[in-house]
Amino acid sequence: MSIVLIIVIVVIFLICFLYLSNSNNKNDANKNNAFIDLNPLPLNATTATTTTAVATTTTNNNNSIVAFRQNNIQELQNFERWFKNNLSYSFSQKAEKVVNPNRNWNDNTVFDNLSPWTSVPDFGTVCHTLIGYCVRYNNTSDTLYQNPELAYNLINGLRIICSKLPDPPPHQQAPWGPVADWYHFTITMPEVFMNITIVLNETQHYDEAASLTRYWLGLYLPTAVNSMGWHRTAGNSMRMGVPYTYSQILRGYSLAQIRQEQGIQEILNTIAFPYVTQGNGLHVDSIYIDHIDVRAYGYLINSYFTFAYYTYYFGDEVINTVGLTRAIENVGSPEGVVVPGVMSRNGTLYSNVIGNFITYPLAVHSADYSKVLTKLSKTYYGSVVGVTNRLAYYESDPTNNIQAPLWTMARRIWNRRGRIINYNANTVSFESGIILQSLNGIMRIPSGTTSTQSFRPTIGQTAIAKTDTAGAILVYAKFAEMNNLQFKSCTLFYDHGMFQLYYNIGVEPNSLNNTNGRVIVLSRDTSVNTNDLSFEAQRINNNNSSEGTTFNGVVCHRVPITNINVPSLTVRSPNSSVELVEQIISFQTMYTATASACYKLNVEGHSDSLRAFRVNSDENIYVNVGNGVKALFNYPWVMVKENNKVSFMSANEDTTIPFSVIMNSFTSIGEPALQYSPSNCFVYGNGFKLNNSTFDLQFIFEIV
């Protein structure tokens, strides 16, 4: 018994000694800022549906590695697998990116020949280049697929970024550079952390990357909608929510828990895209609005790739897929050409990703409340942005302030087989349809703030009518900020062509210094070779006439109209980079708001017998294409008839149409005996009333 007792005492003594020794080790470890957190979640997080746990690591504010317990490993692994499987496709939908980077690496600046710690644009380049390398590392057909050296460079790049970031983050100012230059730190940088961590999830670097992501996104993206003291909404928050959600998964939260967070709920309310009648979001006619009153598709395009992540995270039902599809159809094309009036403030007609978003039908699309008409045919894309007092006609910022004419007056078609020729500093002021008030085309509307400012028209009325293959838009506009420029604009899209008439063009009297105005019919970027002769050479070869002048698959013609003074076509080069076909309008007629111009554009290789007439009065313009399509512009009404279908709309947005308007219209197009049957309206008093005017404002009738 005594021997047994002695053994027991010795064992107890050893246990006590080991316990005390272990406690001292822990205390020493705590002095070195290391800790073990076996339950990093708050108490209510223990209800997670996935309870599998795995040990991993995290960091403290000195970037030293510490232990972490992952409570939702299956959900984490599933998402990371899905992310890698879809990375290349997702990247193809991402507008801001560096594709197939090949920059040399640098242990101080991440990449050679950049100054990312003083230049925010260079920091953005570093971020986008790192993401581009992640795509290469993950692409099985790339020569850098799972390259060990690249893996090291990626984690090292992440380390370098972390070593430069202020801890704690600055409040309402960027870590370096201009105070308000926050974008890359809030939007792009978190995506870098997510991309690097996930593509390295089968390497020795994963634990370190995950711990860095948990720590630094906890500082710079503490919620899905907050960063560096700012609260972000709309397109910005959509981008923020994707890496934020991943960082929360890394912290052990389940997707069900993350969904309940206030910031995530804000984003889900945004991406649900309920139809709205004002403010940010998807308007009832499926036009995307941002900055309260701006058709700002740049934000939607930049965020579009995130929608797949949200449907993975939280289910298919979180996105208004039907509305979003229509929103893209309303403005886009498979080639990526987009009407500039809904695009970026710097003036662009092209998105490198929008063509990948959906399958585009050949159709005519109209947004009756937001005033956009678009036609996509086999041969061309065309679109016009009208005006309404509810929405801005232009938004400027301290850098971009000369694009208002482009946004409001672009009237052209793009041959789908032609080259995509985007604007540059020399060409952005010169586009078909723009009414020039000076020879250099510059019309500045500066922002009155340190950020963006939007401008609404003094007069903003638009009517749209469409059939199966034709669409017409009638615009009555006046812009105080553009020298009180006013006009009525009549545009008709039809097979292989477009008709354009401006009348009642006017400006503030005595404001042009006795310089004639001009309407641009066709513009040529002389720096791009399309195998077309110069406009001047074409004119000389055509007996000193610019009829039929061609550029990049589009042909222009003057359209005469009875009893309207339509100027001849002339050629001019405002600078060495641009050549124009124009119609000159006298400053005297502009002072009295009686100037006019009229032309048509056709797809090269196609012609038509289009004719236009003024019927009875200045406000009644009849256009006959000659292939069953007729249009009538009789302010405030516009009508399009195609074979057995006819549609009407009023620029006053009337929900009733008098019988007299219909009968007078049929008389004006030479078909007074037409019999018709309503398709979306019913007899109401002395006319018809729309069945439902919630989403559109066109009256549609079948000819019987």
From Swiss-Prot:
Annotated keywords: Host cytoplasm, Host nucleus, Lyase, Membrane, Signal, Viral envelope protein, Virion
Q: Please list which residues make up the signal peptide.
A: 1-23
Q: Where is this site: Transition state stabilizer?
A: 345
Site (described: Important for catalytic activity): 395
- E.C. numbers: 4.2.2.-
What happens upon changing residue 395 to A? Complete loss of non-sulfated chondroitin degrading activity
Q: Which InterPro entries match?
A: Baculo_ODV-E66_core (IPR043082), Chondroitin_lyas (IPR008929), Lyase_8_alpha_N (IPR012970), ODV-E66_C_baculovirus (IPR006934)
The positions flagged as active site in the entry are 236 (proton acceptor), 291 (proton acceptor), 299 (proton donor)
GO-annotated molecular function: lyase activity
Top-level class of the enzyme under EC nomenclature: lyase
Gene Ontology CC annotations of this record: host cell cytoplasm; host cell nucleus; membrane; viral envelope; virion membrane
| UniProt subcellular location | Virion membrane; Host nucleus; Host cytoplasm
Indicate the family of this protein.
Answer: Belongs to the baculoviridae E66 family.
Its biological purpose: Component of the polyhedra envelope. Plays an essential role in oral infectivity. May digest, with its chondroitin lyase activity, the chondroitin sulfate barrier of the peritrophic matrix of the host midgut to facilitate viral infection in the epithelial cells.
Q: What's the protein here called?
A: Non-sulfated chondroitin lyase E66
Organism, by scientific name, is Autographa californica nuclear polyhedrosis virus
- List the lineage, top down: Viruses, Viruses incertae sedis, Naldaviricetes, Lefavirales, Baculoviridae
